Amino acid sequence: MLAFILRFIKNKSYFALLAGAWVIIAGLTSQHAWSGNGLPQINGNTLAALAKQYPVVVLFRHAERCDRSDNTCLSDSSGITVNGAQNARSLGKDFNADIQNYNLYSSNTVRTIQSATWFSAGRSLTVDKKMMDCGSGIYASINTLLKKSQNKNVVIFTHNHCLTYIAKNKRGVKFEPDYLDALVMHAANGKLFLDGEFVPG
């Protein structure tokens, strides 16, 4: 009888071990893939589902800047390239297929204004110079935009140092965004939470 009990316990422990391993594997291959930088990847479908529960904030880095590229400028050399404008328009088309209910903001630079304009497909744009200043005060600035938007979703075109700061501050990860890369946050009970990196598709 004792031998049977010991064998049962041993088998049960083995089963528990297998079950635990399966849970881990399932978690890694489920809804959220993970970027190499340690941030969860948020695709359009996941973003749309999140937006049904909370007001979401999507912060994009501007498109390819002209003064750091050999590509043709869209207009002013302090703005973006033609290639960057086309990429912003394509991104906006895909984004708007998943999220339609949002207010659009940008910092007060030519490159962010142009990026947001080409992304927007005619949506009105509000320029806010505070989206250029990125430090601990960025969260209060974002919350102000949410209040102005009456808790609608918010899309902001800003700068790489803003995204880098938020990723480090909220998740402790090093995030070096390329042009038009983005972070997804949501607001709940007056606080902002970083959900991950937006990955179109």
Curated annotation (Swiss-Prot):
Keyword vocabulary terms for this entry: Hydrolase, Periplasm, Signal
Supply the enzyme class, top level.
hydrolase
The domain of life for this entry's organism is: Bacteria
Q: Where in the cell is it found?
A: Periplasm
Instruction: Note the InterPro entries from the entry.
Output: His_PPase_superfam (IPR029033), LipoPS_heptP_Pase (IPR011310)
Say if the entry is tagged with keyword Iron.
no
Q: Which GO terms describe its molecular function?
A: phosphatase activity
Name the CDD domains on file.
HP
Naming one, the record's GO cellular component terms include:
periplasmic space
Tell me, what is an example of a GO biological process annotation in this record?
lipopolysaccharide metabolic process
Pathway membership of this protein? Bacterial outer membrane biogenesis; lipopolysaccharide metabolism
EC number from the UniProt entry:
3.1.3.-
Signal peptide (from-to): 1-35
Q: What is its main location?
A: periplasm
The UniProt entry, under NCBIfam families, shows: PRK15416.1 (NF011945)
Q: Briefly state the protein's biological role.
A: Catalyzes the dephosphorylation of heptose(II) of the outer membrane lipopolysaccharide core.
Family classification: Belongs to the phosphoglycerate mutase family. Ais subfamily.
Name listed for the protein in its UniProt record: Lipopolysaccharide core heptose(II)-phosphate phosphatase
Task: State the organism of origin.
Answer: Salmonella arizonae (strain ATCC BAA-731 / CDC346-86 / RSK2980)
Q: What is the lineage of its organism?
A: Bacteria, Pseudomonadati, Pseudomonadota, Gammaproteobacteria, Enterobacterales
